[in-house]
Amino acid sequence: MSEESNDDKKPTTKFELERETELRFEVEASQSVQLELLAGMAEIFGTELTRNKKFTFDAGAKVAVFTWHGCSLQLSGRTEVAYVSKDTPMLLYLNTHTALEQMRRQAEKEEERGPRVMVVGPTDVGKSTVCRLLLNYAVRLGRRPTYVELDVGQGSVSIPGTMGALYIERPADVEEGFSIQAPLVYHFGSTTPGTNIKLYNKITSRLADVFNQRCEVNRRASVSGCVINTCGWVKGYGYQALVHAASAFEVDVVVVLDQERLYNELKRDLPHFVRTVLLPKSGGVVERSKDFRRECRDERIREYFYGFRGCFYPHAFNVKFSDVKIYKVGAPTIPDSCLPLGMSQEDNQLKLVPVTPGRDMVHHLLSVSTAEGTEENLSETSVAGFIVVTSVDVEHQVFTVLSPAPRPLPKNFLLIMDIRFMDLK
């Protein structure tokens, strides 16, 4: 590390990294930091950096820049922390990628399907990062893996409160992440699987079915396999949901991060042909507070409407109550004795409940279903996009929405989320 200079009033620091080390830094609140690779080669979560190009990271970003052979880096701006570490599990992650690539080559040779990998672990162990890494390494070798997002709290394929899949055709952008051109997205409606575990498992199965259908007609997708990101709920129903996902996708490999107990439980409960691997989390992984998670969710939703760093201009328009049908998936829990004969609480969890538009809808997100009619089973139909209700005029029977596309709405079936978004910026 070299001395700091105050170029353009921003502190600038140079770092000389030895082979197989990484620079870790976190960006201060309300600040941004620029990173530049001056010499050598380096990567961020499997995406190679271009030399002499400045990459900008905004407030709250937590970044690890790794080098296999050594490099020179320059940071400009105020960081909360910035240090070089030799203690990194990257070699273990690379070995995992190499083993998966061998499975893909074997699948090509024997005309079988490629590896289906599920990454599991408690919260804040770096599951999303490992997924990104494995996907980037695969696509850099010419593969076309599918990224499956089962973490409803994060929504990296779409927005929080959804589950989805994305066909990866190029490495993730250093700043923006994976290019989200045509994701397959399903409405869940909450940031916690426990709010409706029956629906969560049903959508997991639906995603697996659609992925299998794609693999039947797309040989490259089949050989490349998939990488499945999961949520950090690993006990009780959360654990059962992991076992269900492994079964639905017929996974070949489960990567367990940082929890020996979970590793042993899965080894015991999954079929013997599933390879279960225990890997350490990176020392750079930091614990995220509830406030930070909420801010990240809000930022993700804001990005959906306004684009990365505000490059889009969303549309505001009125929607008549009579033009749409709004539903919530899952009826409130009632005592078993009050349920109709032959009906269980589980049936109740998948029930479509009509929602009458009212002022309590303000700030709620609505998923625009691709369904043509309710007989299509709205809970298992993908969504075209999302709108947020900004105001409701009960007297004139209209509500105003913020939408990424101009009027009219593509379909008239809407599913309401528990998630709210207040457009304050």
From Swiss-Prot:
GO terms for cellular component: cytosol; mRNA cleavage factor complex; nucleoplasm; tRNA-intron endonuclease complex. GO terms for molecular function: ATP binding; ATP-dependent polydeoxyribonucleotide 5'-hydroxyl-kinase activity; ATP-dependent polyribonucleotide 5'-hydroxyl-kinase activity. GO terms for biological process: cerebellar cortex development; global gene silencing by mRNA cleavage; mRNA 3'-end processing; RISC complex assembly; tRNA splicing, via endonucleolytic cleavage and ligation. Coiled coil: none annotated. Pfam families: Clp1 (PF06807), CLP1_N (PF16573), CLP1_P (PF16575). The keyword tRNA-binding does not apply. Disruption phenotype: Early embryonic lethality. It comes from the Eukaryota. Keywords: ATP-binding, Kinase, Magnesium, Manganese, mRNA processing, Neurodegeneration, Nickel, Nucleotide-binding, Nucleus, Transferase, tRNA processing. Component of the tRNA splicing endonuclease complex, composed of CLP1, TSEN2, TSEN15, TSEN34 and TSEN54. Component of pre-mRNA cleavage complex II (CF-II). Also associates with numerous components of the pre-mRNA cleavage complex I (CF-I/CFIm), including NUDT21, CPSF2, CPSF3, CPSF6 and CPSF7. Interacts with CSTF2 and SYMPK. This is Polyribonucleotide 5'-hydroxyl-kinase Clp1. It comes from Mus musculus (Mouse).
